[in-house]
């Protein structure tokens, strides 16, 4: 990103869009991994106390921001060479988001919480065992210290700069985005 933004000059305009946790119809990465874990009975617990907020970006809002950036990113413009966080602007607890999706799909929700310290220690043991066995720690749904830290850290960003410079205003709120996503998952048979 630094190199791309630094390349912006009088003849070439560049811009960076920084979405966080993209979701929506045709998602093949974020929600499918969570849904599979829940359907397989492998999402019985939340990690931590649930107070950590995360931002989510519905795909249509991301597209809207990309189009706005493309329209405004010309050499010499204030947008050129800038980076913009783009989310729905509605931070919520990660597991609150997940539970809303699971509930609408009639999948089991986590029933208890594991304290951060215990989850982190268990992840350390799991990583050690996976290393001994030669398993791939890079797989998407692994139980790792990184995953535990991620779940127990705030991940939300101000979209004020995108609002100001790009005229960005999310058109689809979280509730509607979840509803549309779940409808698509039901239509296409997510499993």
What is each PLM-predicted segment?
Residues 1-18:
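Active-site Tyr-X1-5-Lys
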Residues 16, 56, 91, 156, ...:
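Short aromatic/basic micro-patch
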Residues 22-24, 62:
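Conserved sequence/active-site signature of Rossmann-fold short-chain dehydrogenase/reductase
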Residues 25-30:
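Short beta-loop-alpha junction of Rossmann-like oxidoreductase domains
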Residues 35-44, 54-107:
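Alpha-helical substrate-binding/gating segment
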Residues 103-151:
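Terminal hydrophobic/aromatic helix or amphipathic segment near a protein terminus
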Residues 157-165, 169-191:
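Amphipathic terminal alpha-helices
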């Amino acid at each position: 990103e630094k190199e791309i933004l630094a390349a912006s000059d009088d003849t070439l305009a560049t811009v960076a869009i920084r979405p966080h946790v993209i979701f929506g119809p045709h998602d093949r990465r974020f929600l499918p991994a969570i849904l599979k874990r829940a359907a397989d009975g492998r999402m019985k617990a939340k990690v931590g106390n649930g107070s950590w907020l995360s931002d989510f970006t519905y795909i249509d809002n991301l597209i809207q921001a990309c189009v706005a950036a493309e329209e405004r990113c010309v050499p010499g413009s204030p947008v050129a060479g800038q980076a913009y966080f783009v989310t729905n602007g509605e931070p919520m607890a990660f597991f609150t988001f997940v539970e809303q999706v699971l509930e609408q799909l009639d999948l089991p929700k986590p029933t208890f919480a594991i304290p951060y310290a215990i989850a982190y220690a268990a992840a350390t043991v799991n990583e050690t065992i996976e290393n001994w066995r030669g398993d791939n720690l890079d797989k998407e749904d692994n139980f790792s210290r990184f995953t535990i830290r991620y779940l127990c850290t705030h991940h939300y960003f101000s979209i004020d700069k995108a609002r100001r410079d790009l005229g960005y205003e999310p058109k689809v709120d979280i509730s509607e985005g979840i509803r549309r996503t779940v409808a698509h998952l039901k239509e296409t048979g997510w499993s």
